[in-house]
Design a protein with these regions (language model features):
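A short, Lys/Arg-rich alpha-helix, primarily the initiator
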Residues: 1-17
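Residues in the recognition helix of alpha-helical DNA-binding motifs
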Residues: 10, 24, 35, 64
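The alpha-helix within a helix-turn-helix
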Residues: 11, 22, 51
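DNA major-groove recognition helix of helix-turn-helix/homeodomain DNA-binding modules
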Residues: 45-60
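Short amphipathic recognition helices of helix-turn-helix/homeodomain-type DNA-binding modules
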Residues: 61-68
């Protein structure tokens, strides 16, 4: 389960718009919105790309995308 509160916080902290984050992560803005609304799951490649775009540490990535 994804910790959307923490993901949103990291996205805000990045100073980038959602559109910029999506583009730098190689996904469409619509796809990112859908995944953040819970209507679709993040693929491993999207998790990796978002982690790189947001400069998340491995611990932060795991806390966000692999929360229990």
């Amino acid at each position: 389960m994804v910790d959307l509160v923490l993901l949103n916080s990291k996205m805000r902290d990045s100073g980038m718009t959602i559109t910029a984050i999506a583009e730098k992560s190689g996904i469409s803005r619509e796809t990112l919105y859908n995944k953040m609304s819970g209507s679709a799951d993040f693929k491993a490649s999207e998790i990796l790309n978002l982690s790189n775009t947001l400069r998340l540490s491995a611990l932060e990535r795991d806390e966000i995308f692999f929360a229990e």
